[in-house]
Regions:
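Catalytic-domain carbohydrate-binding cleft regions of carbohydrate-active enzymes
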Residues: 1-393, 399, 406, 418, ...
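Short, surface-exposed loop/turn motifs at beta-strand boundaries within globular domains
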Residues: 389, 401-403, 414, 464, ...
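Beta-strand-rich N-terminal accessory domains
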Residues: 399-403, 485-499
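Short acidic, flexible loop segments centered on an aromatic residue
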Residues: 408-415
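Contiguous transmembrane helix-bundle modules in multi-pass membrane proteins
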Residues: 421, 461, 481-483, 488-489
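Charged, glycine/proline-rich intrinsically disordered loops and linkers
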Residues: 434-462
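Aromatic sugar-binding surface patches on proteins
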Residues: 463-469
Length: 499
């Protein structure tokens, strides 16, 4: 007599797509093009192939459409019809190394892209990050997600079920599904049906122990794993043999789990804070210190974007300057691509790490250009008619939303080492020269070229000293700027005071 499991089996066809890891982005893109071509045909032509989840991210789809833009309408139709599930991430990031601001922007950009194609999957999807951040529930809740699916970092000594409430910082909490055997425990059905039934016998008892409400999750896929053509027919055959099983998607499966828990009066356990245990899956703790040069550079550029460039653009826009959000998103996307989990881990061959470094170089040039562009727009709003022949201007910015009590450091090309800094009301601003050298012609051309929108021909006569000065920044307004006069041939004995 055949004994069937009491649980209902939910098969979720999916793929985890490493944009770059053992292979470069373009090597992976070649596989990606073939993958999506076949996937589109399968989802359109097999009515029983109801759903496919593409890793909770959108960058891979963007990579595909860069090669085949004419496929956009077909993709969009599948997304609208909830056959293909994408988003909310732009890329699958590490959850520990990037800043909270960068993680949130990643979600905002990815969810907007997915929604633009017809639908953003409304659950968080974190299959392969090496540990979980305590702000994760907060981030997903902020963008309207109804739950989370995650794997690494959790521990069954703490959790008694694969469905629980995850509470992050503050009061933010979301129902969370833990991949009990990992996100790729069943890459695909074997073609031999007898082998499939044996797998059911082996796997279901292990999974039933983790799903109290008898709604068992089978992850039908893994890294780069294409759905088997016979998947829908195999599920149909299992149903005929008495198995209670369906093909499902993350959104509907979460609803089913929560309804079952409510029906069974199952009080979900609350898990609080971060998840950094290696009990159920390796978290490779050592990756937090590999290629520290890349990690430090990424922190520098994500901080520059959030705390310097975007505030400057806001100030500039308030003054009538130009702001192109798509340009800002372009550079955020470069940052996100470097925060893709395998990229920021530095776990790839050196050839892949060189690609990461090249993106850092692009960020260096691009973000500096954004800063200078906004300098130019703001400079146009400054009244220069009050300047005398022996005066210049220095504009200092405070891009933070509060008053600063620290120092501002800046380098200038000046006509004379003896000068006084004055506010518009004539108040003298103390400063200290930290370093001074004679400016070369290259320094002078570069300095004036930046100042004059790369018109290096406008070299101010007499500029010959390059000085670095320190100024107490307490007089700068929050999210604002101050225009100082640089008065040459005057002296002051005052020194800056600050923390």
């Amino acid at each position: 007599m055949k004994v069937l499991p009491l649980s209902k089996i939910h098969f979720i066809p999916h793929v985890h797509w490493d944009r770059e890891w053992l292979r470069s982005t373009d090597s992976s893109r070649i596989k990606l093009v073939y993958f999506y071509d076949r996937l589109i045909e399968m989802l359109e032509n097999d009515p029983q192939m109801k759903y496919f989840t593409f890793d909770g991210q959108t960058a891979a789809l963007e990579d595909y459409l860069a090669i085949k833009p004419f496929q956009k309408d077909r993709i969009s139709q599948l997304v609208k019809n909830r056959k293909l599930f994408i988003g909310p991430w732009y890329v699958q990031p590490d959850m520990i190394i990037p800043s909270g601001e960068a993680l949130l922007r990643n979600l905002l950009v990815g969810s907007k892209y997915a929604a633009g194609l017809g639908h953003c999957m409304n659950v968080g999807w974190v299959p392969d990050a090496f540990g979980q951040n305590k702000i994760t529930p907060y981030l997903f809740k902020e963008i309207g997600m109804k739950g989370i699916f995650a794997w690494r970092g959790f521990d069954y000594d703490v959790l008694d079920d694969s469905l629980f409430m995850w509470q992050g910082n503050g009061d933010a909490s979301l129902p969370t599904v833990h991949f009990a055997l990992g996100y790729g425990h069943y890459r695909g059905f074997p073609e031999d049906y007898e082998e499939v039934k044996k797998d059911m016998t082996d796997f279901i008892p292990k999974l039933e122990a983790r799903y109290q409400d008898q709604e068992v999750l089978f992850m039908l896929g893994s890294d780069y794993a294409f759905p088997r053509k016979h998947s829908s027919k195999t599920i149909e055959q299992l149903q005929k043999d008495g198995y209670d099983c369906i093909m499902n998607n993350p959104e509907d499966y979460l609803d089913t789990l929560l309804n079952a828990a409510k029906k069974n009066h199952h009080q979900l356990k609350i898990y609080q804070g971060e998840a950094r245990s290696a009990a159920l899956g390796r978290i490779h703790a050592g990756i937090t210190s590999t290629r520290i040069d890349i990690k430090n550079a990424m922190r520098h550029y994500e901080t520059m974007m959030a705390k310097v460039i975007e505030p400057m653009i806001s100030i500039s826009r308030f003054q009538g300057g130009y702001c192109d959000q798509e340009l800002i998103n372009y550079f955020w996307k470069i940052i996100f691509k470097n925060q893709f989990h395998d990229s920021i881990y530095g776990s790839s061959p050196d050839s892949i790490n060189h690609t990461v470094e090249n993106r850092l170089l692009n960020l260096r040039h691009g973000l500096n250009e954004l800063i200078w562009m906004n300098f130019r727009y703001l400079a146009e709003s400054v009244d220069l008619s009050v300047l005398k022949e022996n005066e210049d201007i220095l504009v200092l910015f405070n891009t933070l939303p509060y008053q600063r009590n620290d120092y501002a450091f800046t380098s200038m090309i000046v006509k004379d080492k003896n000068f006084v800094l004055k506010r518009q009301d004539g108040t003298i601003v103390p400063y200290e020269i930290m370093n001074e050298v004679k400016a070369t012609s290259h320094d002078i051309e570069y300095y004036n070229g930046m100042e004059n929108f790369h018109d290096a021909g406008e070299v101010l006569e007499g500029t010959k000293f390059k000085v670095q000065i320190k100024i107490a920044a307490s007089f700068l307004p929050p999210m604002g700027y101050e225009v100082l006069k640089v008065c040459f041939h005057e002296r002051t004995s005052k020194r800056p005071e600050g923390d």
